[in-house]
């Protein structure tokens, strides 16, 4: 398994990963569609790292400036998305992608790396906490998903002291 920088031509594959991994248990975002463009708006290939098993992309992490274009916040990077195809889950790929995101954020001069995760997504929370992230805030009942209110949890990692 190797991790590399995404290329523009990875977009369709990354979109398929989003479709395959989407669940309201892990994201309040609308259901992604196969024909949506992955690299659009604020998502740039230089902000995405992909995990390859052989010649197949099996997961990705999107790590980008939290406040793109805002000088006062340029020291903060954010994990905006993490996804691993279901057959490849449980093999340490997510962990390796998070570690790569930490390295990328640090190499960009980041002092902090943050992310948000649903309070109900215990698997992801445990992964991030194993990587050194700590809870920095909770927005109780932030989303109504599947008929229940779910917290949005802000996690952070100090890139200077680790």
Regions inferred by a protein language model and the residue ranges of each:
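Terminal substrate-recognition subdomain of acyl/acetyltransferases
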Residues: 148-162
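Short glycine/proline-centered loop/turn elements that form peptide/ligand docking sites
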Residues: 94, 98, 120-124, 141-146
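Glycine-rich acetyl-CoA-binding "A-motif" of GNAT/NAT acetyltransferases
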Residues: 56-59, 123, 149
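Active-site acidic-Proline motif in GNAT/NAT acetyltransferases
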Residues: 85-87, 91, 119-120
């Amino acid at each position: 398994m190797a991790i590399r920088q995404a290329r523009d031509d990875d977009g369709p594959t990354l979109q398929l990963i989003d479709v395959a991994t989407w669940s309201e248990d892990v994201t309040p975002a609308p259901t992604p569609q196969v024909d949506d463009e992955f690299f659009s708006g604020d998502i740039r290939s230089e902000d995405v790292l992909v995990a390859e098993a052989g010649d197949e992309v099996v997961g990705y992490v999107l790590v980008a400036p939290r406040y793109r274009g805002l000088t006062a916040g340029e020291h903060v990077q954010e994990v905006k998305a993490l996804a691993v195809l279901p057959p490849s889950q449980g093999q340490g790929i997510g962990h390796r992608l998070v570690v790569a995101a930490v390295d990328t954020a640090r190499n960009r001069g980041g002092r902090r790396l943050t992310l948000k995760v649903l309070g109900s997504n215990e698997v992801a929370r445990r992964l991030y906490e194993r990587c050194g992230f700590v809870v920095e805030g909770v927005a109780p009942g932030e989303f109504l998903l599947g008929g229940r209110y779910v917290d949005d949890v802000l996690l952070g990692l100090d890139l200077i002291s680790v």
